[in-house]
Amino acid sequence: MGRDTIADIITSIRNVDMDRKVTVRIASTNITENIVKILLREGFIENVRKHQESNKYFLVLTLRHRRNRKGTYRTILNLKRISRPGLRIYSNYQRIPRILGGMGIVILSTSRGIMTDREARLERIGGEILCYIW
């Protein structure tokens, strides 16, 4: 049985975010690097470093926590894995769901790489729905 690396990084980020820690270390693959680039571009992550440890590469993510008078609160509220190895979910560009009326993002795997729902609608291509972030 294979590992679901996307579910692993989603779970790692969710656990660290709920624990109110700042950094998380995840395994580095092409898919995880592309998803992390999207999270960095959308403002959910402050910083990304690539770390090597005995011929294995890891990504060290610094999560963004906002501050107010009462203390810190989380930026990422929910991450949900949609398409999984046992049940793949595909969508064309017209039927890509809108999360919270466009406030959240959908990460898709398309023929042109991993992108957000807005980019996929602009390029008029569909693909596999990997996860929701809102």
Swiss-Prot record:
It comes from the Eukaryota. It is found in: Plastid, Chloroplast. Pfam families: Ribosomal_S8. Its main location: plastid. GO terms for cellular component: chloroplast; ribonucleoprotein complex; ribosome. Keywords: Chloroplast, Plastid, Ribonucleoprotein, Ribosomal protein, RNA-binding, rRNA-binding. Coiled coil: none annotated. HAMAP family: Ribosomal_uS8_B (MF_01302_B). This is Small ribosomal subunit protein uS8c. It comes from Vitis vinifera (Grape). The gene is rps8.
